């Protein structure tokens, strides 16, 4: 997204424009990489659908040099920031991740549906996560992320946050059909890089849960 889309404009200008997805199903087989300042807008959940059939996340973050995962921020690259995603469905047809919020600051998801492949009554799967954070460290911490009026359905773990992250908010969201609604801090251990601090200031307000096999929200005692 945004990479080499308009060679007559500066990179900053390209990256700060709204990218509109008309209603339809957009089929991909590898992760959609979201750079700093990206703003994606669809025509509504189950109208604009980005569907990934590959064995990877539907959406991941990248820096302005195109680095992803543990390489985000290398050589002084701008890390993912000021990202907005609105009015669409992010869907995976396999037991993988909806969106991985790696080293991102100031991200806003409004009226987005995260749709996986989990069947009601199924068993847990650590690979099937609607929203997760990986590769976040003390230097590059995921922070200030808002999910507003979003739908999460058919992932074994609709939300799974163990890596360092702060101020992640879910407001007026619907969580449906999963083994866990939200799993918070299950893998943090206080010593491993990225798992030393774990999630902090995670908020759920005015939200609902249904058809959850275990806990709606399970917070690690650590």
Question: What is the predicted function of each stretch?
Answer:
Residues 12-14, 33, 78, 83, ...:
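Short, surface-exposed loop/turn motifs at beta-strand boundaries within globular domains
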Residues 4, 102, 139-140:
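Low-complexity intrinsically disordered segments
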Residues 18, 31, 56-60, 82, ...:
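Structural detector of coil-to-beta-strand junctions
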Residues 1-39, 43-54, 89-90, 94:
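N-terminal extracellular ligand-recognition/capping segment immediately after the signal peptide
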Residues 21, 28, 34, 42, ...:
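Extracellular beta-strand solenoids
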């Amino acid at each position: 997204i945004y990479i080499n889309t308009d060679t007559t404009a500066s990179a900053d200008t390209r990256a700060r424009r709204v990218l509109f997805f008309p209603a339809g199903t957009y089929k991909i087989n590898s992760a959609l990489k979201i750079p700093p300042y990206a703003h994606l807008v669809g025509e509504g959940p189950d109208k604009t659908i980005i569907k990934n059939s590959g064995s990877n996340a539907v959406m991941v973050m990248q820096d302005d040099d195109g680095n992803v995962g543990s390489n985000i921020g290398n050589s002084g690259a701008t890390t993912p920031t000021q990202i907005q995603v609105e009015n669409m469905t992010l869907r995976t047809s396999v037991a993988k991740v909806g969106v991985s919020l790696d080293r991102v600051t100031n991200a806003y998801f409004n009226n987005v549906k995260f749709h996986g492949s989990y069947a009601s009554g199924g068993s847990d799967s650590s690979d099937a996560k609607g929203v997760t954070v990986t590769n976040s460290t003390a230097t590059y911490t995921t922070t200030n992320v808002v999910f507003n009026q979003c739908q999460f359905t058919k992932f074994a773990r609709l939300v799974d946050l163990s890596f360092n992250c702060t101020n992640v908010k879910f407001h007026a969201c619907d969580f449906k059909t999963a083994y866990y609604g939200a799993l918070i801090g299950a893998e943090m251990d206080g010593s491993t890089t990225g798992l030393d601090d774990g999630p902090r200031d995670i908020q759920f307000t005015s939200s609902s849960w249904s058809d959850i096999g275990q806990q709606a929200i399970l917070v690690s005692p650590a």
